[in-house]
Regions:
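A short alpha-helical cap/connector motif
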Residues: 1-131, 138-159, 163-213
């Protein structure tokens, strides 16, 4: 992934995030991602997710795409005791590893994991959510927005990672399916009058959309 910010700025933000919260479990999850080239949001974006969730008093979070629980770690910190984070991932191994990590971090009681298709898992849940977070395969982003936008409470948030796609969304010559899907997704979010949205150019771009109507 190409960096959107200068490397020195990226490292500065990471150092600040590390100084705010340290956890050997988090270190282990990050080391695994680095060793196996597994995509995680990283500590600076993780901190952003936690801040966003705390800022609206989120108690119920739906994740569309969870991997082995890295982003769920941050949301679970935010929702507090009695809050819930519903995770989805197609791989049973990821679900088992998420449980192992989050149990050690003391957060597993706030998490439920659905193995299988993210949107099918979402459809099986009842009611609205304070936050829906999207980090599935990029060609699925438009459908995730269409589903999520209907089930976020007034004052709730839609959050989505990788929406700048290493800058490829701004390259007209790039016609890859994943790039075009993210462009469509971003236009759909921006055009929805029920939401006020912006993209934070942190790491690979984070869509932040607040439901106002």
């Amino acid at each position: 992934m190409e960096q959107l910010l200068a490397p020195a700025l990226e490292e500065y933000l990471l150092d600040l995030a590390r100084s705010q919260h340290g956890d050997p479990v988090l270190d282990e999850m990050e080391a695994r991602a680095a060793a196996h080239n597994f995509p995680i949001v990283g500590r600076a974006v993780g901190r952003l997710l936690e801040v966003q969730a705390r800022s609206i008093g989120a108690r119920r979070v739906m994740e569309l795409g969870s991997g082995y629980g890295y982003s769920a770690y941050w949301f679970a910190r935010a929702v507090g005791d009695g809050g819930s984070v519903v995770c989805t991932d197609a791989a049973e191994d990821n679900a088992r590893d998420a449980q192992r990590y989050l149990q050690r971090a003391g957060l597993w009681e706030r998490v439920r994991y659905r193995v299988g298709d993210a949107l099918q898992g979402f459809a099986a849940e009842e009611g609205d959510f304070d936050i829906v977070y999207c980090d599935v395969d990029k060609t699925g982003y438009p459908d995730c927005w269409r589903a999520a936008s209907e089930r976020i409470r007034l004052g709730g948030l839609y959050l989505c990672d990788n929406v700048l796609w290493s800058g490829r969304v701004a390259q007209p010559e790039n016609s890859e399916a994943s790039t075009e899907a993210i462009r469509v997704h971003n236009r759909l979010v921006a055009a929805d009058s029920r939401y006020v949205s912006t993209i934070a150019p942190l790491r690979d771009g984070v869509m932040i959309a607040l439901r106002v109507a």
